[in-house]
Every structure is written in structure tokens, then in C-alpha cells.
Amino acid sequence: MTDRPRLRLHDTAAGAVRDFVPLRDGHVSIYLCGATVQGLPHIGHVRSGVAFDILRRWLIALGYDVAFIRNVTDIDDKILNKAAAAGRPWWEWAATYERAFSAAYDALDVLPPSAEPRATGHITQMVELIERLIEKGHAYTGDGDVYFDVLSYPEYGQLSGHRIDDVHQGEGVASGKRDQRDFTLWKGAKPGEPSWPTPWGRGRPGWHTECVAMAHEYLGPEFDIHCGGMDLVFPHHENEIAQSRAAGDGFARYWLHNGWVTMGGEKMSKSLGNVLAIPAMLQRVRPAELRYYLGSAHYRSMLEFSDTALQDAVKAYVGVEEFLHRVRVRVGAVEPGEPTPRFADALNDDLAVPAALAEVHQARAEGNRALDSGDHEGALRQARSIRAMMGILGCDPLHERWETRDESSAALAAVDVLVRAELQNREKAREQRNWALADEIRNRLKQAGIEVTDTADGPQWTLGGDGK
């Protein structure tokens, strides 16, 4: 598809659906806030990856060349605290869970980003940005830290709608702040923590500064789309805009935010203890089925997890899969065709995946009727269209990704990467006689459906009866 029909996307900054017009004709630049690699990925994390992978695939189908950047936050308070509690180097902890996230994305066939920068690899760019903000009077030093002066930027709140009097950064009280509404750009060095030299002393970057510097480095001072979870609208994305604009640059022209995965009406999060880890989910369903489920709701809506909803999604996916296999057996090879006009209309309407999937299942129903009546040409036509549509959604059952790999083996391989990272943490805790941490890790794995057995050859785990 190269005629590029009109695409409309909901822009959080505008609070409305807008026509999408890229900065450069034929090219789209996207920045997605990636993971803070502090622990195992759960389906709430991966939903964001799947949602914006569909956006990327649709833009490619429309004929755009897409630059897609997804960062890795590998230096953060949570990473430092968890690594210290486990007696591990912070960088090793971050690298371990970065691999776990990569395995989870790969298991669900989320396309690799054009670049995946780590925060620690871009300290120079962050320091340069902060220097510009200080020079322009938008930032100041205090007790070894550097803060952004919120009152110096009158447009603060334009993304989130927050009134300046209602701003709470969630950073706690800091003695170096002139105003508690200000936010941290740079944290002064503390004993035992990593630090880098700067003109105002050693320290490490604040979270909000990291993404601005990396977005500028890979996409320039102005780019098309910034994506992330709706929980990032404030303060993270609001603070990104303030820094970039105050420094004299543009920033993202469209802001897209996905809804949460919820359980019992509450956001899925580690702090609430209601997460469903990827290993547990891959025990219950195949990777393609999990991807179908996570991508089936509108990206801006909440996805309330339930076993019934998951099994309904599996049943729907299997119905499509079985139809395509029937056509291939009775008619012959099924090459991808073109999406239906109604499917294209749905995705052009702010990525309305539920309406797009309704078109997939309508085509399946018509194809089954054609096949049953002996209309092989009609059945093949519907099957080819379905392959195109499901391919854009990233879960075409006949794609070589799912066809040439035994899915249970692929899932098990992904689980193995994730579980062994946790077992490595547990062994180090045992070596240090940190029995409480070792038990905590074992219990966490048990909650994910994984049983650990200590043997003379080291810990072994079982998943659904299969030993590793």
C-alpha cells in the first residue's frame, strides 16, 4: 500500500484526534519510552511494545520509512536499590534484565527498534543539555544537584493540563530546591553509587533528562511521534517537553499514550504485586496468542485482564489459524494479499484495532462459507486478505515466524532466559547467606508458575511439567 490514505491519531497534547502529517514526506520518526530494567517484564510492559509495534507496522504498510527508537533506562534509583539488596553490581543487574526484556519482546515478535540507546551511553549529551538550560536561566544547582526551574517556563503543563499550583513531582522534599515544584535534572554523587564528572560536580542523570537527550541524539530536536504509557504523561513527558522547549528546541509533534493492563480495576504494577510475568503467560498460551490478546483492545483503552478474556482471544486466534490451514490444505499456497478497505479505514482511525479485527473475522466467516460451498477462489481471496491484515497486527498464523518454529519450544526458550536470570540472582543471594532474598526470589518464581528444585548440579526449574 503506497497511496497513503489519511491517517488520524489521538494527540494527547491536543486532546483530540488529528490528521497525521510527518515532518518529512515519506518518513516517520518515533520515540518510545522503553523499560527501566529493574526486574522481569510483565504483560503491562509488553502491551506498550505490542501497541506501538502495530503503529509501526501500519506505517510501513502505508509506505513510510520509519525510524523507531526505544530507549533502555539502565541507571535508576530502583535499579541501584535492588542491585544493592542482592549484592550485585548495578550494571550487571541492569544488563541481566535488559536481556530479559529483549527476550520477551522477541517472543512476541515485536520488531527490533532502529536503535535502542542506553541511558549510560549518553551522559555527554545529557550534560550538554543541562548546561544549555543553566545558561538560559531555566536550571540551577543546589546541594550538588541540578534542578529545572518550573516557573521559568510559562508553558509548563501544556501536555498534562496540570495547573502550576497543583504540580507535585513525586520526588520528595529536597533542600537544594528553590521551589518544591521543580524537578531534578542531575543527582549529586552519593557514596557507593555510580557517578560521572560534570562542570557542577560528579553525579548521575535524572530520568527526565535521559529521554530528552537520547531523542535529540537519534531523531533530532524535532520529530514526529513520542509514545509511552499513559502513566508517563505527568511528570515524565511533561518534564521532557519543558526541557527541550526551554533549551530552544522543538520536540515531538504528536503524543500517543497507551492504556494500562489492569486486574480488578487496578493498574498492573510490581508495587501492587498484581503482575502477570511473561513466563507465566507463555506457560498458558502460545506467543502468537498472547500477542493477539495484548493487541486486541484499542491502544488507548484499559485492558482488564481475566482468564475468560484471555481464552476468548485464544479461541478467536485459533479460528483464524484453522481457516488458513483449511485453505492451504484444500486449495494450495496462501500468499499475503491486501487488507480490506474497511480494515485500512479502521487503522487509519486512530489504530482502531477492535474494528480491524472485526473485519478479519468477517473475512474468515465469508471464507469458511466459500470453502464449504466449493468456491475455492473466493476462499483463497479471503485467506490472502486475512494474512495481510494479521501480518500488520503482527500475528499472521502462516508467517514463517510462527510456522517454521515450534511455538512451544520458542516460548520455552524465552522463558528459560527470563528464569535463569532470576536463578542467578538467587544463587548469589545464597552464596552471601541472604536467605530472605533467596526465598523471595523462589516465591516470586512460584507465583509465575515455576517450581525450583535444588540439586547437586544446581537449581533446576520446571514449567508445566517440562524440566530444564
UniProtKB/Swiss-Prot annotation:
Q: Motif 'KMSKS' region located where?
A: 267-271
Keyword Cell wall biogenesis/degradation present in the record's keywords: the answer is no
Name a GO CC annotation attached to this entry.
Answer: cytosol
Kindly state the positions of the motif 'HIGH' region in this protein: 35-45
Keyword Ligase among UniProt keywords: yes
- What cofactor is needed? Zn(2+)
- Binding locations of Zn(2+): C33, C211, H236, E240
Coarse class of the primary localization is: cytoplasm
Give one GO term, molecular function aspect: ATP binding
User: Cofactor stoichiometry and binding?
Assistant: Binds 1 zinc ion per subunit.
Keyword field? Aminoacyl-tRNA synthetase, ATP-binding, Cytoplasm, Ligase, Metal-binding, Nucleotide-binding, Protein biosynthesis, Zinc
Which reactions does this protein catalyse? Answer: tRNA(Cys) + L-cysteine + ATP = L-cysteinyl-tRNA(Cys) + AMP + diphosphate
In short, the EC number is: 6.1.1.16
- EC class (word): ligase
Q: Which family, according to the similarity comment?
A: Belongs to the class-I aminoacyl-tRNA synthetase family.
Kindly state the subunit structure of this protein: Monomer.
- The name this protein carries in UniProt is Cysteine--tRNA ligase
